[in-house]
A protein has these predicted regions:
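Gly/Pro-enriched, hydrophobic low-complexity segments
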Residues: 104-187, 192-194
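An N-terminal domain-cap segment
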Residues: 32-45
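Flexible, processing/modification-adjacent segments and terminal tails
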Residues: 7-27, 33-36, 64-134, 193-195
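C-terminal segment of classical bacterial N-terminal signal peptides
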Residues: 1-5
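Short, charged low-complexity intrinsically disordered segments located at boundaries
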Residues: 43-53, 97-99, 168-170, 194-195
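Envelope-exposed proteins and targeting segments
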Residues: 26-28, 41, 50, 57-59, ...
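An acidic-aromatic
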Residues: 42-91, 154-161
Length: 195
């Protein structure tokens, strides 16, 4: 008899399954910690399709799929823009859901520790020097295909920003209005239209 060996899925298959799992889960709320060269921060992101509400220390960002509003508490100012997919990469840690299908070379790597049994390590290297994110490393839980951690290196930088997923709640029923800036909630804020 021939011993059966479990086939290791390839990087694209892992990311396809992770993206599919994310889309099936409806509204998602994630809390996270970021360790970056410019400092550490904590935050949360609520996602529904391509919409998100990102809250970090001092900054709240709404994105309705087209328009983005970023509120800076320190200046009581809201910047309004229509970001390109490239600009969204540096704002939304979940932009990899659409990025991996183009302009990135994918591979599965060993995690180098005991988590090899519980997580896939997928390395995404940009194929174009113009890509804002030159390298993204995703640790994806086997079974659920949920991201556990991601590491990102931007163009022109040697240092990675590492995002640790602290909690991942699914099945949230978010109204589309959650992803749009509510002027009434910030009556004194100055709007700066960058469109």
């Amino acid at each position: 008899t021939i011993p059966m060996v479990a086939q290791q899925p390839d990087a694209r298959d892992i990311l396809d399954r992770a993206a599919d799992a994310f889309r099936r889960e409806g509204g998602v709320k994630i809390t996270f910690s970021v360790r970056a060269p410019e400092g550490n921060t904590n935050g949360s992101i609520r996602l529904k399709g391509d919409k998100f509400l990102l809250e970090t220390e001092g900054v709240t960002t709404w994105f309705d799929g087209r328009t983005q509003w970023s509120y800076l508490a320190s200046s009581d100012e809201v910047n309004v823009s229509e970001p390109t997919p490239e600009e969204l990469q540096s704002i939304n840690p979940y932009s990899w859901l659409s990025l991996y299908k183009q302009d990135y070379k994918l591979k599965v790597a060993k995690t180098g520790n005991a988590s090899d049994d519980t997580a896939y390590k997928v390395v995404m290297n940009a194929t174009k020097r113009s890509q804002d994110m030159q390298c993204i490393i995703l640790y994806i839980e086997k079974g659920s295909f949920r991201p556990l951690k991601l590491s990102m290196v931007q163009r022109g930088s040697k240092d990675a920003a590492v995002v640790f997923i602290n909690s991942y709640q699914t099945g949230k029923n978010y109204d589309d209005s959650l992803f749009v800036f509510d002027r009434k909630a910030y009556p004194t804020a100055e709007l700066v239209d960058l469109r």
